Amino acid sequence: MRLSIAAALAAFALTTGTSTAAQDSFEDQVAEYVRTFPHRLTYDYTVRFTGGDPRNLNRWIGNGEPALVRAGADVVPRTNNDTYYKAAALFLEDGPVVIESSTPAVDRFNSFQLIDDRNANYRNIVFPSGKYTLYFGARPKQFEGEAIKVPSALTVVIARVEVRNKNDPDDVAAAKQLFAGLEISGAQPSQFPKLDLPAHPADVVAEAHRRMDEVFATVPFTRTVAGPGREPGRDVPYLYHAAGTKGGWGGPVPEHSAYEAMLLDGQGNVMKGSNGTYALTTEAPPVDAFWSVTVYDTERGGFLHPNEADRYHYNDTTALENANGTVTFTFKRGCGAADRNCLEVPAGRFDVVARYYLPREEIISGAWTLPRIELVAAEPPR
């Protein structure tokens, strides 16, 4: 597998190896790289997920066993840790693919998220039931369940199933039963898709990523997500879309789940574990499903931070409430047994993402947001 991934990535480099026109200005080149970045990253993840092997397309990635993402599985930045995942990269040139929820449930959040080759959502199906036929091009004369037209031949399906408490055997069993009923079937692609985009000079790429990182740190994540009625370049600026793709590829539309990313504290400063203890106190967010708070290691690319407790998030089931019904989260190095709702952070920079599943209108509109994270106990210099 390691060799096939390397070969596929080498092929990716070759297909994007033509240089940009010399007459293009620096700003034009930055703008073009930003515009095409979501295509590049979606293709890159497709290669990583499948090893560049067409036999791994149109099927669930990996062994399909339910597991929460843990530290060390560093593939997609800011992957959530509060649901089971299934994902598949589909190539529909050779025919449609059918996805199915054969054991549907409405008492536990679950969904099919469908994104195109630009990391733009074209459909989010919450509480799926039965079969859905995904097709590209002409509508098939015969199909199973609901027929869904896909805007690109290459598409990704992400399935999520809520896990309320990984330490509760009954809850885990119920989540696994629902997860096991998520199925996929379709034609075996005859070839792996190719991407043909121009290469860009290093200074252009560096400047584009600097701008993406600045946007991701300062613009609400919901404003970076593309989907129905949120077309990249028209409703969502290309730079915003690229920033959201880099910082949280595969993010769904806010009506499915709204994400609130916090890379700065309430004073506008970057958060570092070496600074001391940080805290956040909030009332329950207005959602119709569930919500969670997860911590990430910013300096390691926005991945989960390894810790002995193997805990990366709290949700509305596992978090302990204060006497007045609010919830206080603590972020620090070396969480102890007496620390309530404590998430361990690295010595360097960290960030926090709150997820609101089936958020109400006040979250979608931005009228309701979390209070800011504050440094509550400074650590003396060492």
Predicted region positions:
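Bacterial Sec-dependent signal peptides at the C-terminal "C-region" and cleavage site
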Residues: 14-24
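Bacterial N-terminal signal peptides
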Residues: 6-16
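A compositional/structural signature for long, glycine/proline-rich flexible linkers
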Residues: 22-382
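Positively charged n-region of N-terminal signal peptides that target proteins for export
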Residues: 1-4
